[in-house]
């Protein structure tokens, strides 16, 4: 089961946290659609900023949006002008006052989403898929990853028949719930069709919060 399911989804509430935090009741569907639309719009708008995650919280009658990015300067702009424009746009979309936070991703080589997007961009620039995968694996392990697994699927190298190619180095224990595994996907639109990229990065083990607190009490 651990091999098939989304590794972040299965660890929610154990060692991973939700990207959206709010309680809605009857407005659940409305809030969910707003979140999906906002994430898609921001991803398109901030493509050059290497956005990893967008966290959305909705305390009473306002919203807190946190953007995790490898290039915060691109979003903030000159004298913080970009961030204010973006905050107004998000506020108009959500219909409530918005507090916008920008957080820097210190090690983009260990962020599965950014690694997957990096490989996808290289494939669009006609870099050989094996070279792009090897480069990503090497830089992730140098940055301190315990293990990494990459899957690239589609008409690789313009082949007639689509196939999947895997590259794996180190440990990626998908069945171990305390294993901190980051997972990211991306699509590369090439002249031969779409190539899908999946990345799993194992960063080490985290003891679940309950276990840790009981151990410290003893």
Curated annotation (Swiss-Prot):
Residues 38-106 form the KH type-2 domain. GO terms for cellular component: cytosolic small ribosomal subunit. Keywords: Ribonucleoprotein, Ribosomal protein, RNA-binding, rRNA-binding. The keyword Hydrolase does not apply. One of its GO terms (molecular function) is rRNA binding. One of its GO terms (biological process) is translation. InterPro entries: KH_dom, KH_dom-like_a/b, KH_dom_type_2, KH_sf_prok-type, Ribosomal_S3_C_sf, Ribosomal_uS3_bac-typ, Ribosomal_uS3_C, Ribosomal_uS3_CS. Part of the 30S ribosomal subunit. Forms a tight complex with proteins S10 and S14. Binds the lower part of the 30S subunit head. Binds mRNA in the 70S ribosome, positioning it for translation. Belongs to the universal ribosomal protein uS3 family. This is Small ribosomal subunit protein uS3. It comes from Legionella pneumophila subsp. pneumophila (strain Philadelphia 1 / ATCC 33152 / DSM 7513). The gene is rpsC.
């Amino acid at each position: 089961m651990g091999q098939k399911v989304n590794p972040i989804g299965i660890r929610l509430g154990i060692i991973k946290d939700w990207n959206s935090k709010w309680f809605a009741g009857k407005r659940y569907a409305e809030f969910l659609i707003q979140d999906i639309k906002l994430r898609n719009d921001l991803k398109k708008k901030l493509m050059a900023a290497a956005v990893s995650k967008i966290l959305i919280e909705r305390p009473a009658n306002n919203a807190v949006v946190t953007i995790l990015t490898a290039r915060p300067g691109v979003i903030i702009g000159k004298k913080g002008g970009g961030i204010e424009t973006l905050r107004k746009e998000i506020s108009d979309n959500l219909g409530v006052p918005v507090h916008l936070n920008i957080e820097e991703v210190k090690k983009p080589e260990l962020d599965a989403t950014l690694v997957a997007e990096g490989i996808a961009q290289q494939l669009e620039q006609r870099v050989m898929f094996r070279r792009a995968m090897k480069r990503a694996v090497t830089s992730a392990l140098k940055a301190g990853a315990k293990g990494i697994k990459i899957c690239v699927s589609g008409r690789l190298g313009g082949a007639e028949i689509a196939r999947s190619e895997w590259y794996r180095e180190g440990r990626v224990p998908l069945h171990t719930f305390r294993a901190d595994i980051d997972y990211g996907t991306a699509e590369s639109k090439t002249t031969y069709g779409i190539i899908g990229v999946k990345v799993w990065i194992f960063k080490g083990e985290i003891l679940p919060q309950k276990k840790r607190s009981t151990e410290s009490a003893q």
